[in-house]
Regions:
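Low-complexity, small/basic-enriched stretches
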Residues: 2-14, 19-98
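Nucleic acid-binding interface residues in structured DNA/RNA-binding domains
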Residues: 32-43, 94-158
Length: 158
């Protein structure tokens, strides 16, 4: 899921290095299952490969389903059920006490940005500039463009 990124936050609860452990890159299954979730903000399509989430999009959003393989099929799986449970908690105003495992096969930079977003505490936000600052620190660079972060966030399939 893409957190809102409009205000500064306090120190993150977990580092993006810790969040990286949640992001799996190895392929477990070639079968991708999808399901629909009716959220208060609109219909969400959830995709997973049996071991991890691979996509989560509001229907009709830009890049909707861009990472879905042609053979994706509607179905049920424990991964999709776990994502539904997380969304139920989130949209009911309760802090989920777990984070579904996600498979995010992308560039190293986009994975770092995703890890930083996962470190944003529940109910808080972070600016693209702050995410860029943290990503630059992780990459050993002096600075990084907030626009590059915006591109990474926009292409995040979850």
């Amino acid at each position: 899921m893409q957190p809102r990124t409009t205000a500064r936050t306090s120190k993150p609860e977990i580092s993006s290095a810790s969040a990286e452990l949640i992001l799996k890159s190895e392929i477990i299954s070639n079968v991708i299952y999808t399901c629909k979730y009716a959220s208060p903000l609109g219909v969400i399509t959830i995709a997973g490969d049996g071991a991890a989430l691979t996509g989560l999009w509001f229907d009709g959003q830009r890049y909707f389903g861009s990472t879905l393989p042609a053979g994706a099929a509607e179905g049920r799986s424990p991964v999709l059920d776990e994502a539904r449970r997380w969304l139920d908690l989130y949209f009911s105003g309760r802090k989920p006490d777990f984070t579904p495992t996600m498979r995010y096969g992308s560039t190293p930079f986009r994975r770092i940005v995703c890890g930083i977003m996962l470190s944003i505490p529940y109910g808080q936000t972070m600016t693209y500039s702050e995410i860029a600052r943290r990503a630059a620190a992780e990459l050993g660079r002096g600075s990084m463009s907030a626009q590059a972060v915006g591109g990474a966030v926009g292409h995040n399939p979850i």
